[in-house]
Regions:
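A short, hydrophobic secondary-structure junction motif
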Residues: 42-57, 103-115
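A generic structural signal for short, solvent-exposed coil/turn residues
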Residues: 7-9, 55, 70, 99
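Short structured motifs
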Residues: 2, 62-64, 91-92
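Surface-exposed short loop/turn segments
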Residues: 67-135
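Functionally constrained cores in energy, signaling, and assembly domains
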Residues: 21, 60-62, 117, 150
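A structural "domain/chain start" motif
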Residues: 1-53, 124, 137-181
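Short beta-strand->alpha-helix linker/helix-N-cap micro-motif
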Residues: 58-70
Length: 181
């Protein structure tokens, strides 16, 4: 558990990303065996690439593995906790939050100037706020609204799926880290 007195060094020269752990997540994606293994690998790769692209807006960003870390910068890693592909058929036919997808992560941020073994910041993404959650739609946004408050079509299933949840999760991570720049 990080100490409340230890803070992230602002404006790191570099941000590093280690692949998020896929081993402990609850995977509800309609696959098993080698198909599930391949899905997890592809999902992790796509997620990491999108996160790297978005973190580049804050500082130069590159992939690193935990056993090959420099002495300065931030390391962003974490674990997928829930990956639920939902039901495209229900999203398309019924809408209104039925068949929703879910992507939840726990993110750990290490300040390599302070420690390579103890994270400084931890937060969860994709977890609805019970005070504001309507119980409908992916993530914590009301059914029929995107993360930007723009209307989405529930009739065609647009604005749904793990691809959108991945984009939303990466944006959420970057928005939180931007507060520490």
């Amino acid at each position: 558990m990080p100490s409340a007195s230890v803070k992230l060094t602002p404006n790191p020269k570099n941000i590093y990303i280690a692949p998020f752990d896929t081993s402990t997540a609850k995977w509800m994606v309609g696959r098993d065996g080698i198909e599930l293994v391949n899905f997890k690998e592809d999902f992790q790769t796509n997620f990491t690439h999108q996160l790297q692209t978005r973190l580049e807006k804050l500082a130069p960003t590159e992939m690193r593995w935990v056993n090959d870390l420099p002495d300065h910068g931030w390391l962003v890693t974490g674990e997928f906790t829930t990956v639920d592909q939902g039901s495209r058929a229900l999203r398309t036919a019924v809408g209104l939050g039925f068949g929703e997808t879910t992507l939840q992560t726990t993110v750990y941020v290490y300040d390599l100037d302070v420690s390579k073994t103890q994270y400084i910041l931890s937060f969860r993404t994709g977890v609805p706020d019970p005070k504001h959650d309507t119980g409908a739609g992916s993530g914590s946004f009301p059914a029929g609204l995107s993360a930007l408050g723009e209307p989405i079509s529930t009739a065609t299933g647009l604005g749904s799926g793990l691809k959108l949840d991945t984009t939303r999760t990466c944006r959420e991570i970057v928005a939180i880290l931007a507060q520490y720049m």
